[in-house]
């Protein structure tokens, strides 16, 4: 996405990321969803970094590509922990936070080890390749975990509406990127085409979170189980 379109999308994404944090502070949910807001703050910092490298070296430069892949790996790891924080919120009353944290760290370590085992067979720019592959694998892991979490949410009698909105938006986000990476793995030539849409879709997650923080009342609750039953034909 060369030229002015790149700058426009990056600038829009930066504004939306800042808006998420502002809305969270305004609605007094910053501490409750601290990891999600930390992710947005890091996104904001990375966006400014990408602005700087893009303006200095250009979209097709190696410096921009390296910065993009390394920063994307970092953001994906933090997004993974953002998802785990939603697990902690859903299962808060069950007091299983310790086990969830241990399981999350074990899963991340296992994913990292698997990724390294795959990329270690290639001696060409192994660190960059590792960052790229780790991001891909974490998107697939995040996709599975999000739908497992959603299945658990559907079993609950009442769930905060805001939490439901956040889980659903993450599900859509992980689904898109996992599908794009799956297609690019099947047909490597497609990556250059589908990656054009990454910055655009990247704007949708902060947009949905900002909307949820701003519009959904903190005390609003709904019954996902009833919604699931309502969708089943009798």
Residue ranges and their predicted role:
Residues 6-7, 123-148, 156, 195-198:
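Extracellular-loop-to-transmembrane junctions of the mid-late helices
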Residues 30, 46-68, 184-191:
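Helix-loop junctions on the outward
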Residues 148-234:
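C-terminal transmembrane-bundle signature of multipass membrane proteins
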Residues 23-35, 87-101, 127-128, 154-164:
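Membrane-interface helix-boundary motifs at transmembrane edges
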Residues 59-70, 125-136, 162-166, 189-199:
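Non-cytosolic membrane-interface motifs at loop->transmembrane helix junctions
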Residues 17-26, 51-59, 70-102, 113-123, ...:
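Internal transmembrane alpha-helix with an interfacial aromatic "cap," most often the third helix
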Residues 4-17, 58-88, 104-108, 194-206:
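Individual alpha-helical transmembrane segments in multi-pass integral membrane proteins
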Residues 38, 42-45, 72-81, 100-120, ...:
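Alpha-helical transmembrane segments of multi-pass integral membrane proteins
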